[in-house]
Amino acid sequence: FHLSSALKAANAYKKKGTSATLIFQYLFLLIFSSRSMYMNLLIGKDTPDFAKDTVYRFMKMLQINWIRFTTILSSRIIKDAIVPLDSADRANVLIIDDSMFERNRSKKVELLAKAYDHAKHCYKFGFRMLTLGWSDGSTFLPVNSILLSTENKKNRVNDAKEVDKRTVGYKRRMLAVEKGTIAMLELLKSAKKADIPAKYVLFDSWFSSPSSLHSVKEIGYDVIAMVKKTPKMFFRYHDEDMPLTTIYNKNKKRRGRSRYLLSVKVDVVKDGIIIPAKVVYVRNRNKRNEYLCIMSTDVNLSEDEIIRIYGKRWDIEVFFKVCKSYLNLSKECKSMSYDAMTAHTAIVFTRYMMLSLESRESNDTRSMGELFLYFSDEMSDITWIQAFQMLLQMFRTLLADHIDISNEKIDELVDAFMDAIPILLKSKLQAA
């Protein structure tokens, strides 16, 4: 998928010294060695041809647009490897959600903030990793992300360092202190510019508001989202503005074991502009006496189709779990630089793209975690086999230099040695 050209398009290149592609490749493969860069340098194993300072300078480069890099790479994978194999009527979606990027034990990290973790219902030090992903219902690919600090200066532990205002790094820092709904629109615009094929944008109630629905619609996507049952948010129903709870109480519900309780058409009004929408009230499985509201700006979709498409939003939750449990998201990078943390996030996203694509192309029933462990074992085998082959080549060279023996005889000795080793080891060496 032309990784080097994607890096170059994102301004990740060097005029001299080690190429950016080699440094990125080293960081990409680091997780599969089960050791950090520090431990590799300490024990002298799997050490690169460049110093650690080269890696740190690369990750702190201000001019690299990591949002653009992951967007371009995911766009190429989607267009070249996934969409051609999908049916034309499949509903491809973009999914927006955030997750905690924890730095609880840090004090001097750039733009560090006290953020609320909605999953654990407590405040933590770190960032909100706002992520945009793509899914066709079978394969999920991360598209881009931004590490959000907070627009509230009281909750911000450290401010951004002074950088050149013309650089991508400065724009990245300015976006980090914007509201999540504004940052979400920037990520969607980046995906739209890359022409990623998707018709709907899915998000939960944290991002749902009439303003957000209008903004996403202006970019060119329909929205299917969960909406809060708050008395402060109004929608126009029968020429009257009212909250969703009032609309629910005014209508007769469906009886029996139906997938939904009620379906109504409303108008989403913002600054005099009206967008027609359909609201589907579904029963809350966790609390049977309560209901949830799913809204779609595509009123031509059936209620069952709205519920089915919104179910694809769960893919991004699986993505967050795999990245944190297996791909060392936030654990591998302890840098205090905001640019380095952004680079680390892009590298983790690229690793997940590889796992996701491998799972799809191999028609593999294994989970992402199982695939990760498989690749880790495979990397260990390759390293060991390379060392064994080097020893075998040195043995052949010593025989040729110090003993008067023909090449045919050396081949016979090597073949006899290979026949004498265990079958399992022999099969791995022959496969290599």
Residue ranges and their predicted role:
Residues F24, F127-L130, I182-K189:
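Short, contiguous clusters of charged residues that form electrostatic/catalytic patches at enzyme active sites
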